[in-house]
A protein has these predicted regions:
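Catalytic machinery of carbohydrate-active enzymes
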Residues: 1-195
Length: 195
């Protein structure tokens, strides 16, 4: 199995997992502002972000659409991220409209978060938001996944590939990411809710 330098060194030290916890702090003013923005929601709040800056981390848009259609009856779904986020019906779109800190403040009011390995994954962890993270296989969950999260990944022979830039292309059609089903994400969220 291919390993990156962190995994290699962890194995040499006899460590199976490095448990890191992020921290993110909001001011009282930021918290109050976000509370006013989210008080209108009458169902549990599910925050989503569908895109990372790296294409190899982006779960297919049609999967997101199916996921949203399955969840919008029971959740107020808020969409965070930047202006490149796709537009979906049945979500409260904040994507592309907020600063990073405003997005974090809104996220702090969410009950759950679903998204890719991205900045918002780290912020959600720092805010103690229960999360389902769709990793695929381009990165190692052992290196970047938080143990509190439900980290969904596949590990075909080519993974982790560590492809970062748009110049590098996946020769396997991102099967590690595309093989994570909507049902798997739904079930993972339901398991979080039961905890």
């Amino acid at each position: 199995k291919r390993q990156n330098i962190i995994e290699h060194n962890m194995n040499r030290l006899g460590l199976e997992q490095y448990d890191y916890k992020a921290s993110f702090y909001l001011s009282k003013k930021e918290k109050e502002w976000a509370k006013q923005q989210t008080i209108k929601f009458d169902k549990p709040i599910l925050a989503i972000c569908t895109k990372s800056k790296e294409e190899v981390k982006n779960w297919p848009e049609e999967n997101w659409l199916e996921l949203i259609q399955n969840l919008n009856v029971n959740f107020s779904i808020i969409q965070l991220g930047d202006e490149t986020e796709p537009t979906f019906e049945c979500v409260h779109r904040y994507a592309g409209k907020l600063s990073m800190r405003e997005s974090a403040a809104i996220l702090a009011n969410a009950d759950y978060f679903i998204g890719p390995d991205s900045l918002l994954m780290h912020i959600a962890n720092g805010l103690n938001i229960q999360s389902v993270i769709i990793f695929g296989g381009s990165r190692s969950v052992n290196c970047f996944g938080y143990s509190e999260n439900t980290n969904l990944s596949n590990t075909p022979d080519c993974s982790p590939c560590w492809i970062h830039s748009t110049d590098n292309k996946c020769n396997e059609s991102l099967k590690c990411l595309h093989n994570i089903s909507v049902i798997k994400v739904l079930n993972s969220l339901m398991d979080l809710i039961k905890k």
